[in-house]
Amino acid sequence: MIEVVVNDRLGKKVRVKCLAEDSVGDFKKVLSLQIGTQPNKIVLQKGGSVLKDHISLEDYEVHDQTNLELYYL
């Protein structure tokens, strides 16, 4: 189990617990429940690269306490 920190760049930080093997799409579903937004309205970035829904967090080298940027569509 890892904890990922998601920052929406408007001052809101959300900590989400998940598994490293989870896909980005599954992670967005968990995140959307915490922030009250639909998963298809969320874009996640790490280091300026947009994360694709079908790839796992582990493949993007997202580890415990990794920071991701959150953008709304």
UniProtKB/Swiss-Prot annotation:
SUPFAM superfamilies: Ubiquitin-like
The Ubiquitin-like domain, residue ranges: 1-73
Domain of life per record: Eukaryota
Matching InterPro entries: Hub1/Ubl5 (IPR039732), Ubiquitin-like_dom (IPR000626), Ubiquitin-like_domsf (IPR029071)
GO MF annotation list: protein tag activity
Listed GO CC annotations: cytoplasm; nucleus
GO BP of this protein: cell morphogenesis involved in conjugation with cellular fusion; mRNA splicing, via spliceosome; positive regulation of RNA splicing; post-translational protein modification; protein modification process
Keyword annotations from UniProtKB, A to Z: Ubl conjugation pathway
Keyword NADP attached: no
Keyword Nucleotidyltransferase: no
Protein function: Forms conjugate with SPH1 and HBT1. Involved in morphogenesis.
Protein name: Ubiquitin-like modifier HUB1
Native species: Saccharomyces cerevisiae (strain ATCC 204508 / S288c) (Baker's yeast)
Top-level taxonomy: Eukaryota, Fungi, Dikarya, Ascomycota, Saccharomycotina
Gene: HUB1
